[in-house]
A protein has these predicted regions:
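Glycine-rich portal/gate segments that line the openings of hydrophobic small-molecule binding cavities
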Residues: 29, 39-86, 134-145
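Hydrophobic beta-strand positions in extracellular immunoglobulin-like domains
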Residues: 11, 56, 71, 111-113
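Short strand-connecting beta-turns/loops that link adjacent beta-strands
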Residues: 14, 45-47, 74, 100-104
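Extended beta-strand/beta-hairpin segments
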Residues: 2-4, 55, 99-100
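Hydrophobic pocket/interface hotspot
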Residues: 18-21, 28, 52, 69, ...
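Beta-strand/loop substructures that line and gate deep hydrophobic ligand-binding cavities in soluble
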Residues: 81-134
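Hydrophobic ligand-binding cavity/cleft-lining segments
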Residues: 1-47
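Short, surface-exposed coil-to-beta transition loops
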Residues: 4-6, 62-66, 89-93
């Protein structure tokens, strides 16, 4: 598993609304500027994607990645991992979703990557954190308006 960076925010929306947006992975391109397209290959018995391919553009990183999603800890946690990609050799991530009981939700997004080409660790972490913070901000904007 790749070493992970993470960020946490509180969203002014009930957990069910936050989960509805996060679990609708096919719609990510409509609110996440880093995700350009999503193609679902496999779903579980509840219709949730378990294997999909995304086209991602995060800063200087442009890649196509096939990911596996693990829904066994949903709705509180949804981890994903890389099956294959063009440039990345590893990508692990997860969303932690905590219902605060007051129509707010705390979301933590963690992400770790490794690339096929040599990249200084500091630069890799900077791109990870930029991607995480941008995704969290765009999720918050989508839900809070």
């Amino acid at each position: 598993m790749a070493d992970m960076s993470s960020s946490t925010t509180t969203i002014e929306a009930p957990a069910d609304e936050v989960r509805a947006v996060l679990f609708d992975i096919q719609s990510y391109p409509s609110w996440s500027s880093a995700i350009k397209s999503v193609e679902v290959h496999e779903k579980d018995d509840q219709g949730r994607p378990t294997k999909l391919t995304i086209k991602v553009e995060a800063g200087v990183l442009k890649d196509r990645a096939t990911l596996s999603y693990d829904w066994s800890k949903a709705p509180e946690e949804v981890p994903f991992s890389l099956d294959e990609a063009d440039m990345m050799t590893e990508m692990d991530g997860r969303y932690l979703i905590k219902d605060n009981g007051d129509d707010t939700t705390t979301v933590t997004y963690s992400l770790g990557t490794s690339l096929a080409m040599p990249v200084p660790d500091m630069m890799r972490r900077k791109v990870e954190m930029s991607t995480i913070e941008q995704t969290i901000a765009q999720l918050k904007q989508k839900l809070e308006g």
